[in-house]
């Protein structure tokens, strides 16, 4: 005999349909849209920072007054 396993869902439970009003529903959807856009923009900023940091350091270093060699710009010392 195989025992049935049940999955318990963690997180906030959805409110019942009778207790929600249209104003709270619209506020909830506005919050969700704001949250989605915030997460999307932060992910894009993270990727841009990840791939743009080293080229930025190289550009700033090459525009400095005593022009260093590329090796000096890339070395951590």
Curated annotation (Swiss-Prot):
Listed Pfam families: Tom7 (PF08038)
Residue spans, topological domain Mitochondrial intermembrane: 65-77
Gene Ontology BP terms: protein import into mitochondrial matrix
Stored InterPro entries: Tom7
Tissue: Expressed in roots, flowers, young cotyledons and leaves.
Entry annotated with the keyword Transport: yes
Induction: Up-regulated after antimycin A or rotenone treatments.
Segments in the Cytoplasmic topological domain: 1-46
Region Disordered, annotated ranges: 1-30
Designated name of the protein: Mitochondrial import receptor subunit TOM7-2
Protein's gene: TOM7-2
């Amino acid at each position: 005999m195989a025992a049935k396993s049940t999955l318990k869902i963690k997180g906030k439970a959805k409110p019942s349909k009778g207790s929600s009003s249209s104003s709270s529903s619209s506020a909830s959807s506005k919050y969700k849209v704001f949250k989605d856009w915030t997460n999307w923009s932060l992910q894009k900023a993270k990727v841009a920072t990840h791939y743009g940091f080293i080229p930025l350091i190289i550009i700033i270093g090459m525009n400095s007054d005593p022009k260093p060699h590329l090796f000096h710009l890339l070395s951590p010392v």
